[in-house]
Structure formats: C-alpha cells, structure tokens
UniProtKB/Swiss-Prot annotation:
Keywords: DNA replication, DNA-binding. The keyword DNA-binding applies. This is DNA-Binding protein G5P. It comes from the Viruses. The keyword DNA-binding applies. It comes from Escherichia phage If1. GO terms for biological process: DNA replication. Homodimer. GO terms for molecular function: DNA binding. Belongs to the inovirus G5P protein family. Binds to DNA in a highly cooperative manner without pronounced sequence specificity. During synthesis of the single-stranded (progeny) viral DNA, prevents the conversion into the double-stranded replicative form. G5P is displaced by the capsid protein G8P during phage assembly on the inner bacterial membrane.
Amino acid sequence: MSELGNLETTVTGKIKRFNNGGGYYYTTVVSPAADAYSFPPVIRIKSKKSLGRVGDEIADIHCRITGYERSFPYTDKQTGEQSRGFNVDMLLELLE
C-alpha cells in the first residue's frame, strides 16, 4: 500500500449494519478494542458501493476522514440565556 496522505487512514473491523440513501452506502464498522478494558471503536464509512454484509470482516479499507458541524439551540441552566451549541460529526469516506 502506498503512503497515507493527510486525513487518510485504513480501517479493519466487522460490519455491524449498513443503509443506503442518496446514492451512497453508510456502513457502521466495529474495530477491535485496543485492550480487554477499553471499548471498541465504532466507525461510519460512506461509499458508492457496498462493503459487504452484516457480520463480514473487512481489512485495510483506505478512507479519508471527513466531517461536518451542526449547531443547535440550548438554554444555559445557570443564566437562562439562549445560546447555540455545536457538534462535529465525523465520517470516513471510502477512497474508491
């Protein structure tokens, strides 16, 4: 495999679920935990083709890290002031 570029990674794990919409597949993958006492990472991969079926294992899938920001309204519990919070949703895109 060639050297990884900026914001690129590889993924190995087991397909937990997938759905498709808008011409893309969105596959949820569970990767092995770092050790017996930590939680396994859960990753979502966007692709133009299916990566497999539920329960299939995938290895060294080359992806680019992407994401987007979402804002939401909230009320500060101490002051009662209305404000906006922000979440960042990260997603991996299959390099096809």
